[in-house]
Amino acid sequence: MYENLLPRFLRYVKTETRSDATSTTTPSTQTQVAFAQTLKKELEELGMSDVIYNETNGFVIATLPSNVEKDVRSIGFIAHMDTADFNAVNVSPQIVENYDGESTIPLDKEGKFTLNTKDFPNLKNYRGETLITTDGTTLLGADDKSGIAEIMTAMEYLINHPEIKHGTIRVAFGPDEEIGVGADKFDVAQFNVDFAYTMDGGPVGELQFETFNAAQAEITIQGKNVHPGTAKNTMINALQLGIDFHNALPADEVPEKTAGEEGFYHLAAFAGTPEEATMTYIIRDHNREIFEARKAKIKEIQQTLNAPFDEERIKVDLFDQYYNMREVIEKDMSIVEIAKQAMEELSIQPIIEPVRGGTDGSKISYLGIPTPNIFAGGENMHGRFEFVSLQAMEKATNVIIKIAELNAK
């Protein structure tokens, strides 16, 4: 249906654009800067207007002007350029046409890694479809290059089909979503839309307007290391204090034991020696009150464990990352209803459920543009088992076009 969609997607995923959490630049990697320039050129060649690369925040933005005389709300469509922290060098996508919904798909030549319905029962949903997989050595990058390809293809289609009426549409492709800072510098005034959607969801039908509230705790523990043979009543083992800290948290409130709207504490890093140790926690909850209570629990444990000492052995740097965008979006649910209607008119069953994570839309919503999240089609993201269906990407492209059309009525 969209002859350029698959070639466009394959071209994008072969471009390495991982973000780097240790970087102090925006974008965090030069590969993203180069990719942004490539996308800027492509947008210009499509015939989009006001194409800009913002060097301050790393976003490429462009405008498709309205082709209706009446005033209608302006819409934004957003996707991110970076991929997750997994090998993304020399991505070599494989194409499996007319998948039968049952067979095992070998990824690497040795057959060490496979996509099979035992481990990935979601494969059964793709009978008769064209799957794009990895070769087992890298991720694919459908998160979120499928979103970029879908937005780009939808804009191309609308430009080539002026009979489809729409208001002003703006698109934005940004950096560093995977490391949680992509939208920190997003320029709401420059983007200038009434509402937007991130095309960054998973399987067909996903429509999300509720995310976690998110915080991070960086913990530094100062021990006192002496020879173990003479350590009694003298040694303060920073590693043991770290273990004590972790054990003071609720044992069942961790990612591997929670689902749905249950929040958690996640020990993301723990390193050190008896002399000094560091820990990183991410704290997540959909409920704002429980979220605040979780942060308070971290501080309470710090105070309890510091109490026996004559100095502060445990220091906590606790900071918020993003908030549940539902608090913003529920003030005007019409933007969710438009997306829902678009899917239903395309015979797509909307799957409306909270995101157990965040999106760029989480921050952009609080910056002033309500921004729900729509499926982009990918499955098993962030690793070698990632795949996407061509038909899923076509459906996402259809949804973008249908939203634009419905908004203009």
From Swiss-Prot:
<feature type="binding site">
    <location>
        <position position="80"/>
    </location>
    <ligand>
        <name>Zn(2+) 1</name>
    </ligand>
</feature>
<dbReference type="GO" id="GO:0043171">
    <property type="term" value="P:peptide catabolic process"/>
</dbReference>
<protein>
    <recommendedName>
        <fullName>Peptidase T</fullName>
        <ecNumber>3.4.11.4</ecNumber>
    </recommendedName>
</protein>
<feature type="binding site">
    <location>
        <position position="382"/>
    </location>
    <ligand>
        <name>Zn(2+) 2</name>
    </ligand>
</feature>
<dbReference type="InterPro" id="IPR010161">
    <property type="entry name" value="Peptidase_M20B"/>
</dbReference>
<dbReference type="GO" id="GO:0005829">
    <property type="term" value="C:cytosol"/>
</dbReference>
<dbReference type="InterPro" id="IPR001261">
    <property type="entry name" value="ArgE/DapE_CS"/>
</dbReference>
<keyword id="KW-0031">Aminopeptidase</keyword>
<dbReference type="Pfam" id="PF07687">
    <property type="entry name" value="M20_dimer"/>
</dbReference>
<dbReference type="GO" id="GO:0006508">
    <property type="term" value="P:proteolysis"/>
</dbReference>
<comment type="function">
    <text>Cleaves the N-terminal amino acid of tripeptides.</text>
</comment>
<feature type="active site">
    <location>
        <position position="82"/>
    </location>
</feature>
<keyword id="KW-0482">Metalloprotease</keyword>
<dbReference type="InterPro" id="IPR002933">
    <property type="entry name" value="Peptidase_M20"/>
</dbReference>
<keyword id="KW-0645">Protease</keyword>
<dbReference type="InterPro" id="IPR011650">
    <property type="entry name" value="Peptidase_M20_dimer"/>
</dbReference>
<keyword id="KW-0862">Zinc</keyword>
<feature type="binding site">
    <location>
        <position position="143"/>
    </location>
    <ligand>
        <name>Zn(2+) 2</name>
    </ligand>
</feature>
<feature type="binding site">
    <location>
        <position position="178"/>
    </location>
    <ligand>
        <name>Zn(2+) 2</name>
    </ligand>
</feature>
<feature type="binding site">
    <location>
        <position position="200"/>
    </location>
    <ligand>
        <name>Zn(2+) 1</name>
    </ligand>
</feature>
<feature type="binding site">
    <location>
        <position position="143"/>
    </location>
    <ligand>
        <name>Zn(2+) 1</name>
    </ligand>
</feature>
<keyword id="KW-0378">Hydrolase</keyword>
<keyword id="KW-0479">Metal-binding</keyword>
<dbReference type="Pfam" id="PF01546">
    <property type="entry name" value="Peptidase_M20"/>
</dbReference>
<dbReference type="GO" id="GO:0008237">
    <property type="term" value="F:metallopeptidase activity"/>
</dbReference>
<keyword id="KW-0963">Cytoplasm</keyword>
<dbReference type="InterPro" id="IPR036264">
    <property type="entry name" value="Bact_exopeptidase_dim_dom"/>
</dbReference>
<dbReference type="GO" id="GO:0045148">
    <property type="term" value="F:tripeptide aminopeptidase activity"/>
</dbReference>
<feature type="active site" description="Proton acceptor">
    <location>
        <position position="177"/>
    </location>
</feature>
<dbReference type="GO" id="GO:0008270">
    <property type="term" value="F:zinc ion binding"/>
</dbReference>
<comment type="similarity">
    <text>Belongs to the peptidase M20B family.</text>
</comment>
